[in-house]
A protein has these predicted regions:
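ABC family nucleotide-binding domain
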Residues: 1-160
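H-loop (His-switch) and adjacent beta-strand-loop-beta switch element
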Residues: 157-170
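ABC ATPase nucleotide-binding domains
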Residues: 172-175
Length: 175
């Protein structure tokens, strides 16, 4: 979480100013799930281990975190790929593993940076349907994208130009 010069920034009632790196990492791990455009999977860990990683940092036992990771892989349609390494997966499969990893710690907010940027159109629709389903279950989702079809699948579109909000409009709310 970045520092700031003016104003007040809170996360779930916690003032985010002068936090230690450890406390900031704890808050990030508990409150925010990240989906990266480049997936950021750990190359020497299989799908289950990649998905289970946030739970490791929360002190969850290996047996429990691996069982939960399998559930989340099943949720994204990849249970059969649990033991596969990232280099054995397609871009869409890697992205779904990354989504499962972002969701497993049950964060309150998901920050998704170009979550469909590396995907074909069919997989883009599948990923957006999954994100929409999770959003409808009550999870706040912030998606950064340059793809008009992805933006329009959201409830609200905030267009930013040169670091400033240019417009706020209603999205279609479906893929």
């Amino acid at each position: 979480m970045d520092t700031y010069d003016t104003g007040i920034y809170t996360l779930n009632g916690q003032l985010i100013r002068n936090l230690s790196e450890t406390r900031a990492a704890e808050l990030r791990n508990r409150m925010i799930g990240f989906i990266f455009q480049s997936f950021n999977l750990i190359s020497f860990k299989n799908a289950v281990e990649n998905v289970a990683l946030p739970l490791y940092y929360q002190g969850v036992s290996r047996k429990k975190r691996n069982a939960m990771a399998l559930e989340y892989l099943d949720m994204v349609g990849l249970k059969d790929w649990a033991e596969h390494m990232p280099n054995e997966m397609s871009g869409g499969q890697k992205q779904r593993v990354a989504i499962a990893r972002a969701l497993i710690a049950k964060p309150q907010v998901i920050l998704a940076d170009e979550p469909t940027g590396a995907l074909d159109s069919k997989t883009t629709v599948e990923v957006m349907e999954l994100l929409r389903r999770v959003n409808l279950e009550g999870l706040t989702m912030v998606i950064v994208t340059h793809e008009p079809s992805v933006a329009e699948a959201t409830d609200r579109i905030i267009r930013v130009k040169d670091g400033l909000v240019e417009t706020i409009e209603k999205g279609l709310g479906h893929v």
